């Protein structure tokens, strides 16, 4: 079975080694055929704390790493210009 991959935007980097990635899914409504957007937020593992809010990233499915974390950062596609603050 192939691992699932998603592309999304980092919306929160306040946790240690974890980021929240928002993935937008677009699909036609079954009855009205209008394109509907649904946003899903995934908690993803970021072992080096390299991602900052606004980065476009690719995440992949992995084994459960915590109660809510089942995704890991595979690569950073677009880096934002924000400087990362030092976490205390």
Curated annotation (Swiss-Prot):
Keywords: Ribonucleoprotein, Ribosomal protein, RNA-binding, rRNA-binding. GO terms for biological process: translation. One of its GO terms (cellular component) is cytosolic small ribosomal subunit. PROSITE patterns: RIBOSOMAL_S17. GO terms for molecular function: rRNA binding; structural constituent of ribosome. The keyword rRNA-binding applies. It holds the Pfam family Ribosomal_S17. InterPro entries: NA-bd_OB-fold (IPR012340), Ribosomal_uS17 (IPR000266), Ribosomal_uS17_bact/chlr (IPR019984), Ribosomal_uS17_CS (IPR019979). One of the primary rRNA binding proteins, it binds specifically to the 5'-end of 16S ribosomal RNA. Part of the 30S ribosomal subunit. Belongs to the universal ribosomal protein uS17 family. This is Small ribosomal subunit protein uS17.
């Amino acid at each position: 079975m192939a691992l699932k991959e998603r592309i999304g935007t980092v919306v929160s980097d306040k946790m240690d080694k974890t980021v929240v990635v928002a993935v937008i899914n677009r699909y036609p409504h079954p009855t009205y055929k209008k394109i509907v957007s649904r946003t899903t937020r995934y908690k993803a593992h970021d072992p080096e704390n390299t991602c900052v809010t606004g980065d476009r990233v690719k995440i992949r499915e992995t084994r459960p790493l915590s109660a809510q974390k089942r995704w890991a950062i595979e690569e950073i596609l677009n880096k934002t210009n924000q400087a990362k603050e030092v976490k205390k």
